[in-house]
C-alpha cells in the first residue's frame, strides 16, 4: 500500500503520494506567502508586488493557522522565532509581554497560539525569506518577485 499524506492547498485537502508530496512541498516552499487577508498592509504588498498573479501559495493565517512544522521551517530560514514575532500585535500589550523577558520557546508558543503574533507578511521565494513590511524588506521582495 502506498503511503500518502494529507496537505492543504488553496483551501482544499489533498491526499498525495510520498513523491507527489515532496514535489508539492518543494513548490510550496519556493513561492509562498503567509499573510492576513484583512490586513491592508499585506493587501498593498501583495498587489504592488504582483504576488497574487505569480503562482504563490497564499496562506491566510487567520483561517489556515500556521502549523508547528511550518513555523519551525520559517525559523530555520529566519534564524530565530523572535525575528518572526510581531510586537505590534494588540495582545502583546494586553498580555504585558513588553515587560517580560521572552525566550525563543516563548516566541514560538505565542505565535502558534495567536496568529497576530506572526510578523507579516512572511514571503518565501526559493531559499530566501522576507519578513514584515519595512520599506527595505518590501523593496527587496519586489526585486525578488520580478
What are these regions (language model features)?
Residues 55-57:
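Conserved beta-strand segments of alpha/beta enzyme cores
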Residues 15-29:
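Short, Lys/Arg-enriched N-terminal segments with co-localized hydrophobic residues
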Residues 51-53, 79:
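Short, well-ordered coil/turn elements that cap or connect secondary structure elements
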Residues 29-48, 59:
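Local sequence-structure signature of Cys/Sec-based thiol-disulfide redox active-site neighborhoods
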Residues 61-141, 145-146:
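Thiol/selenol-based redox catalytic cores and closely related redox-interacting motifs
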Amino acid at each position: 500500500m502506498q503511503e500518502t499524506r494529507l496537505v492543504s492547498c488553496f483551501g482544499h485537502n489533498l491526499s498525495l503520494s510520498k513523491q507527489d508530496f515532496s514535489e508539492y512541498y518543494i513548490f510550496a516552499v519556493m513561492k509562498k506567502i503567509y499573510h492576513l487577508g484583512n490586513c491592508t498592509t499585506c493587501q498593498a504588498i501583495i498587489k504592488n508586488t504582483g504576488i497574487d498573479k505569480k503562482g504563490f501559495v497564499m496562506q491566510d493565517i487567520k483561517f489556515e493557522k500556521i502549523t508547528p512544522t511550518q513555523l519551525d521551517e520559517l525559523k530555520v530560514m529566519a534564524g530565530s522565532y523572535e525575528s518572526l514575532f510581531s510586537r505590534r500585535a494588540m495582545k502583546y500589550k494586553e498580555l504585558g509581554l513588553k515587560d517580560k523577558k521572552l525566550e525563543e520557546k516563548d516566541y514560538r508558543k505565542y505565535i502558534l497560539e495567536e496568529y497576530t503574533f506572526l510578523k507579516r507578511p512572511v514571503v518565501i521565494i526559493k531559499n530566501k525569506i522576507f519578513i514584515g513590511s519595512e520599506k527595505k524588506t518590501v523593496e527587496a521582495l519586489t526585486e525578488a518577485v520580478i
